[in-house]
Amino acid sequence: ILSRSESDITGIPTGFAEMDKMTAGLQRGDLIIVAGRPSMGKTSLAINIAENAAIGNQIPTAIFSMEMSAEQLGFRMIGSIGRVNQSKLRTGKLSDDDWPRVNSAVSLMSNAPIFIDDAPALTPTEIRARARRLKRRNNLGLIVIDYMQLMHDAGTKENRATEISEISRSLKALAKEIDVPVIALSQLNRS
């Protein structure tokens, strides 16, 4: 018999109350595609969700970033967690008020189960192998992929739309196989 839990969130909390209310959190085995035009905040949203999972809830989180280097992603996360302006971080022109927040953010990140893989142009098979390893070694709980159009499917010789469709199917199979939510970012173009 099912009993009502204290929280209405049955999956991984995103850190966004309204989203969690609508979805009950990110559910195991789900593929969540976040699509939008360039520079609309897809990566920022995914990073915020990953931070909430790994730092706020100690859920081992893998980020496969084919767009940004691990260093760039790390700086974005430090800025987000520490509430420090990105350009100040990049240039090193931090105020005396910024330093404690940066130090706190670095400390939180160093103790969080966040795994960043910035290898370019991964295939679904390569992501599956890496995710399986993280699941086995670290009990992986969430995967973020930034972004699908930078992936390639070695077995597909069709057009790009068919290839992206096949990549989506592979990512859904991965989510079900290792029983974690997978957030895949997708860039929409004008056409």
Regions found by a protein language model. Give the residues of each.
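Pre-Walker A segment
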Residues: I1-D30
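Cytosolic-facing regulatory segments adjacent to core modules
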Residues: K21, S44, N48, N52-N139, ...
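Short hydrophobic/aromatic beta-strand immediately N-terminal to the Walker A/P-loop
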Residues: I32-I33, A62
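The conserved Walker
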Residues: P38
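Conserved glycine(s) of the Walker
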Residues: G41
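Substrate-engagement module of ASCE P-loop NTPases
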Residues: N52-I55, E163-I183
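Residues immediately C-terminal
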Residues: L150, R190
